[in-house]
Amino acid sequence: MGNPSNRTSMRGQLTLRGVVIGVLGCVIITASSAYKALKMGALPWPIIFAAVISLFFLKLMGNASLNEANVTHTIMSAGAMVAGGLAFTIPGAWMLGYADQISWLDMFIVALAGTILGLLATALIHRHFIVDAALEFPTGNAAAQTLRATEAGGKTGKQLFGSMAIAGIYSVLRDALGVVPSMLCTLNIPGVTFAIYNSPMLLSIGFLVGFAPVAFWFAGALLGNFGIIVGGTAAGLFDIVTAQGIVKSLGMGLMMGFGVAVVLKDILPQVAGIVRGLAADSSTDTDEQSLISGSLKLDAGIIGLGTAAIAVIIAVALDLGPVPAVIVTLFTFVTTIMSAQSCGQTGIDPMEIFGLIVMLIVAAFAQLAQVKLFFIAGIVAVACGLAGDVMNDFKAGAVLGTNPRAQWIGQAIGGIVGALVAAAVMVALVTAYGPDAFGPDKSFVAAQSSVVATMVSGIPSVPWFAGGFIAGIVMYWLGIPAMMIGLGVYLPFYMSLTAFLGSCVKLAYDKWAAHRDAGSGLSGKEKASKDAAFQEQGLVVASGLLGGESVVGVILAFVSVGLSLLG
């Protein structure tokens, strides 16, 4: 990727209409991402969806380049991972009874601090990971290819908004009016919530993630629910309550072991090379490679002042104190590098694991109230989540020839908007549903937050957690997706079953596409083009179903809060 002059190449890429479209989309995607992360315990990358929508709306307003769409979707998707960072950590404090000790301002400061630290870190590491190391960043690469495939236009808008409307109306009928049931095909199995969740969103998640990964997810669900809970209790090894604690501990251990294994296997061996690379980059940099101000010297000053300011803010406003604030700030830079490396090589960003690691490091050096530990995990998770999103966007920009400074500025706009929206949505949800609605087997499973809460308060079964932790590390080294298995073990069975059904639909969809093309007589290039359009159609419809239910869920929460305020 070349780096032409920032001031000239930004023209036509970072535009007023792009900013407006991006900010509006950012509000919707951030709100729906917070809801998805809490409701489903998962948050798929929104970059490809945002890329398709950005180009569609820009084309409605006239001629649009792929570079303008690239910057617009950078703004649009930025808030999603900010919301994820909050949703994967802060609700753990609600589960422990600290809801009244966390205000909207606290959550906004956590989100803003993580956003700014993530932005400053990515300004430093962009050149190394994107230009010099040239890591794959599969999600960013896919977003670039999707933009190219979508450029010709088509039925994207009708497919998207039609599916969003269907899912939204269905959600109102289910959640607001009670016309349709939330669960289907329920069976009374002691200790197991066996049912199909009547949710377009969860079916869509299974479709979007794909059959193979979700098959491992479902295998974990079968192991935890029928292997341990049903099998273990039937054999008289333990009672149902003990079995459920074992399952939660095992699931958490597998997920955390996976996250630590990513750090040990894929990231730490690269740290020395990364540091050498960053040092080499700085010796050859020119002002054209500045992402913040257009001047590298001014960038250095801004990064230094910004870092110091954030350390002071979290020390004072969040009452962490000077030493914990400095530790958090410094280790956040380290973990954003780890996040970038992980996303670049695997497409996975275990941001809540990085938050846990820094939280435990700080807890070893300082005596802080439990609620403050969640703030630390939240700051780090937001920074790492945003860093993963930024670096994927940078990769898409490298493929398309977009100016990285335009993208970084767009990411800053979207990240700050996302911090505001994410904090507001979190407050709306906990106010509307109450803190007791969050946790395992509750309305909002908040799986990652529950892991954080457990690490703070105590693990139900330490031996099973330790076994899962070791197994997670070993499985990752063997190429087995321990994170997906652990997620299946941990989540309620009805969620895993529903996601699995969605992945089966994706399997059938792919087989239908292959069968349809087999006897078409088209050339290889024509088949590839037709298949890409068919896959895009599935992506858009599934994303619309997912987005429609998520957005309506957030709207219903705000309506509930408004009605309660009116008395």
Task: Walk through the language-model features, giving the residues of each.
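Alpha-helical multipass membrane-protein architecture
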Residues: M1-G567
